[in-house]
């Protein structure tokens, strides 16, 4: 009897020990570290979480600093990135990774013709965000900027005149960008979204 009880206790203990510890939930404003962990690992900070999906384990993080003011690419050149001719269609674009990959796959000298994309550290999974991703970023800007400040990053400025490129293309002549108020624009009467215009570039990555 004692042996059976001991065997059962050992089995229960083994099961408890063998169960993996649940990963802590990720929140907007958490720090992304170099080892791809989030929260407060104490490692090297590389980004700030600005969106978390339904699993509470995965989402998107924005880089700590801008890459400068760069042009998107040449005007009147068709790219493999799908055209988004309406604001609704542009906001539905959540795949900056795919957009960036398509541009970087072109045979042209990328650094000359597509500076905003060349600035991305794509080999380490950083990419130019799509319009839908920029909108998510702007909606959580207070939390994101607080965390950026805490780790010595550059806050995302809402100073009038600041404009941020997305990887979402409007047409052969222009691409979408976000202004300092979080509004999205392409080429129109008021805002000139021609691809050769210089705008702020900030990378994001998925985790």
What is the meaning of each model-derived region?
Residues 13:
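Residue-level recognition of phosphate/Mg2+-coordinating polar/acidic sites
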Residues 1-10:
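Bacterial N-terminal signal peptides that target proteins for export
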Residues 100-127, 131-188, 192, 206:
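An exposed tryptophan-centered "aromatic clamp" motif
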Residues 16-122, 188, 195-207:
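Short, compositionally biased
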């Amino acid at each position: 009897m004692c042996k059976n009880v001991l065997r059962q206790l050992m089995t229960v203990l083994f099961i408890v020990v063998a169960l993996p510890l649940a990963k802590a939930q990720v929140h907007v404003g958490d720090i992304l570290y170099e080892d791809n962990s989030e929260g407060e690992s104490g490692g090297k900070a590389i980004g700030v979480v600005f969106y978390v999906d339904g699993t509470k384990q995965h989402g998107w993080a924005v880089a700590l600093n801008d890459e400068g003011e760069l042009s998107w690419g040449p005007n009147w050149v068709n790219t493999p990135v799908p055209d988004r001719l309406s604001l609704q269609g542009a906001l539905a674009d959540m795949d900056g990774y795919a957009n960036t990959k398509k541009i970087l796959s072109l045979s042209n000298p990328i650094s000359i013709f597509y500076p905003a994309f060349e600035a991305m550290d794509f080999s380490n999974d950083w990419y130019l965000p799509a319009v839908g991703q920029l909108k998510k970023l702007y909606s959580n800007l207070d939390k994101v900027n607080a965390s950026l400040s805490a780790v010595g990053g550059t806050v995302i400025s809402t100073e009038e005149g600041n404009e941020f490129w997305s990887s979402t293309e409007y047409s052969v002549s222009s691409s979408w960008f976000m202004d300092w108020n979080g509004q999205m624009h392409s080429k129109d009467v008021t805002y000139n979204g021609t691809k050769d215009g210089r705008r702020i570039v900030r990378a994001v990555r998925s985790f």
